[in-house]
Regions:
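Active-site bordering "gate/hinge" segments
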Residues: 2-215
Length: 215
């Protein structure tokens, strides 16, 4: 299943084509839209927002039953819900959290493969690069930063990411072995100590799902 904003339509097409080329039997696209989402929260009554439609629950169960891999592409405007009633947002989040609990558990326990990626959305790009000469330049600059972060500019991006993931895993393994009781952060104006519970677990950039597949 692919969750992606309508603004990223062309990227969605590329992802769907590649998924089928790699052997996917079905690619379900769950479109998101900042404008439609905002209008819903501004105008829908509370009794509608704190209830999750049965079709959404049925879709979740369908995805779980078929052990569907999940890819979330995030590009939303960080300020899309500015000014929206906080009680409405809270009620909706609580309802979704309860109804989608099976999916959350399956994801957190890596019973299915999942990942989250970023795409350059216009409103997001304008907030990150407010001094860009044009909207197009702002989006290009944000894509550039995303590509750098994801090693896209490397000669072999996949190998570069695998090497990065291996480094992260080695760090996580070390932290799990040490089992520090706390983390102490210091900087100008900062002196923060965060306690850690016994038997805490550090994770990195990769995992193995219940079917023994790496992701």
């Amino acid at each position: 299943a692919l969750s992606i904003d309508v603004e990223q339509r062309e990227l969605a097409h590329l992802i769907v084509k590649e998924a089928y080329a790699l052997g996917a039997h079905e690619v379900i696209v769950q479109w998101t839209d900042d404008v439609i989402n905002r209008e819903k929260f501004l105008h829908a009554p509370m009794e509608r927002l704190d209830n999750v439609p049965e079709y959404k629950i049925a879709e979740m169960n369908y995805l779980l039953e078929n052990k569907a891999s999940r890819l979330g592409v995030r590009s939303s405007d960080p300020g899309a819900l500015n000014g929206v009633d906080a009680d409405k947002l809270s009620a909706s989040a609580k309802a979704m959290g309860l109804s989608m609990k099976p999916m959350r558990i399956a994801t957190q326990s890596n019973k299915v493969s999942w990942t989250v990626a970023a795409a350059a959305g216009l409103e997001w790009a304008k907030k990150v690069f407010p001094n860009a000469a044009s909207d197009e330049e702002a989006v290009d600059l944000l894509w550039d930063q995303i590509f750098k972060t994801c090693r896209v500019y490397e000669a072999d991006p996949v190998k570069a990411w695998e090497e990065h993931a291996a480094i992260l895993k080695s760090k996580a393994d070390m932290l799990n072995k040490e089992q520090f009781s706390a983390l102490h952060y210091t900087a100008p104006g900062t002196d923060l100590t965060l306690g850690l519970p016994k038997n805490h677990v550090w994770e990195s950039a990769g995992a193995i799902n219940a079917q023994g597949e790496g992701f």
